[in-house]
Amino acid sequence: MTSEAAPASTAVTYKRVMLKISGEALMGDQGYGLHPPTVQRIAREVQAVHRLGVEICLVIGGGNIFRGLQGSAQGMERTTADYMGMLATVMNALAMQAALESLGIFTRVISAIPMDQVCEPYIRRRAVRHLEKKRVCIFAAGTGNPYFTTDTAATLRANEMACQAIFKGTKVDGVYDKDPRKFADAKRYETVSYDECLQKHLGVMDASAIALARDNDLPIIVFSLDEPGGFCGILRGEGTYTRVQG
């Protein structure tokens, strides 16, 4: 397996980043589960950034398979429902690993819940070493604890891995004052503060994740994952996005 690198002259803004995407992003137009062509398309977006020499961490939600809050709302014990959601993220991580490795990118799935036969346990120093070797690290099973979202897990791992930013791939090209899919007069922020996101409930991430990013001065870049080349373009200083910062 080989992995092509970008020419040394290619200028990028970041050396190490965290990409956070929802499980629903892997569904395509389906209502449930994984849509292999969509998984492959997202893998190619990651490949384009990897070719720039950027070290990539990745966290994927599990909502396309099971969402803990929904299970809890239907009468299931919240802790059990959350653990089921964590297992769903492992399934998504394995699917993305297969897609990335089919493109020649060395990838490691690292789980907060030990399951040695399918992925590595989370050991911070080992994960950092993988990144230094230009392997993509997919962090699965959230934080390993119930009551924490994958947004919070992504922010935690981004801080532990010393990432320079979190890239939140969504259905829209940034943060808006209201849902642009419902309101034609919705306005996009170029930049917005962590506190404003919290005060106005802008829906960037959950409150715990935003507070953790704020307390560690970790920027959040919100962009459209549906825009071809969008992830790579932002790293080249192009494209449309919103930057959440202090």
Curated annotation (Swiss-Prot):
Record-level GO cellular component terms: cytoplasm
A molecular-function term among this protein's GO annotations: UMP kinase activity
Top-rank EC class of the record's enzyme: transferase
Disulfide bond sites: none
Region of interest called Involved in allosteric activation by GTP, as start-end residue ranges on this chain: 28-33
Keyword Nucleus: no
GO process annotations (BP): 'de novo' CTP biosynthetic process; UDP biosynthetic process
Residues annotated for UMP binding in this entry: 62, 82, 143-150
UniProt-listed InterPro entries: AceGlu_kinase-like_sf (IPR036393), Asp/Glu/Uridylate_kinase (IPR001048), Uridylate_kinase (IPR011817), Uridylate_kinase_bac (IPR015963)
Protein activity control: Allosterically activated by GTP. Inhibited by UTP.
Catalytic activity reported: UMP + ATP = UDP + ADP
Gene3D superfamilies in UniProt: Acetylglutamate kinase-like (3.40.1160.10)
Keywords, in A-Z order: Allosteric enzyme, ATP-binding, Cytoplasm, Kinase, Nucleotide-binding, Pyrimidine biosynthesis, Transferase
Repeat among keywords: no
Localization per Swiss-Prot or TrEMBL: Cytoplasm
Pathway: Pyrimidine metabolism; CTP biosynthesis via de novo pathway; UDP from UMP (UMPK route): step 1/1
EC number(s) recorded for this UniProt protein: 2.7.4.22
Residues given in the record as ATP binding sites: 20-23, 63, 67, 170, 176, 179
Cited function: Catalyzes the reversible phosphorylation of UMP to UDP.
SUBUNIT field: Homohexamer.
UniProt-listed PANTHER family: URIDYLATE KINASE (PTHR42833), URIDYLATE KINASE PUMPKIN, CHLOROPLASTIC (PTHR42833:SF4)
The family this protein is said to belong to: Belongs to the UMP kinase family.
Name by which UniProt lists this protein: Uridylate kinase
Lineage of origin: Bacteria, Pseudomonadati, Pseudomonadota, Alphaproteobacteria, Rhodobacterales
